[in-house]
Amino acid sequence: ICRKLYFLFPGDCFYLKLIYYLEMGKKLRLKNPKAFSEKLQWLKLYDRNPEYTKMVDKISAKRYVASMIGEKYIIPTLGVWDKVEDIEWETLPDKFVIKTSNGGGGGGVFICKDKSVLDIKSVSKKLNFALKSNIYQQYREWPYKNVKPRIIAEECLESEAETGLKDYKVFCCNGEPKLIKVNYDVETDYKSNW
């Protein structure tokens, strides 16, 4: 539905108000946002720091982090490709992660634990779909507007813990950290802890 609405309502402010109302069931307050979700919409419209585009592109974000704190904090890259047909599947190790550079969430992320049973055709189809997704058009997240859709493969990190690897997210309001969210069991039974 977002893709269709994008072309009907080209103005970012009107579009975000409409989508917010449809998803949240209430009016979006942009003049004095109080709720976290309202503040996020305000940021989409008024905080246009060009550095954000580097941060949402998974490939350029890795380069940025490496330049700031060092390569040892970066998951090693196995390959980068512009299209699915260019992926050199035979050169990838038995375990790896492959994902698109232009998306958020997990729609374009695939964790391979055993390449011998990987359905390359299915993963390729899903990667192609993810490469065509446009978060800027769907949600007006402007940092994604100029991200070149690519595919990146990385080493697969594993944990000895029963819950697997943990993903920490720090949420800030007005520049201050307010919440820490820990995601775990993302491969089997997704759980969050606030």
Model-predicted segments: where are they?
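Charged, low-complexity, helix/coiled-coil-prone segments
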Residues: 1-12, 32-33, 65, 164-181
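Intrinsically disordered, low-complexity segments enriched in polar/charged residues with Gly/Pro
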Residues: 15, 84, 98, 156-158
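A conserved helix-loop-beta module that forms one wall/lid of the active-site cleft
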Residues: 32-115, 120-142, 148-150
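Phosphate-binding site of ATP-dependent enzymes
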Residues: 92, 116-194
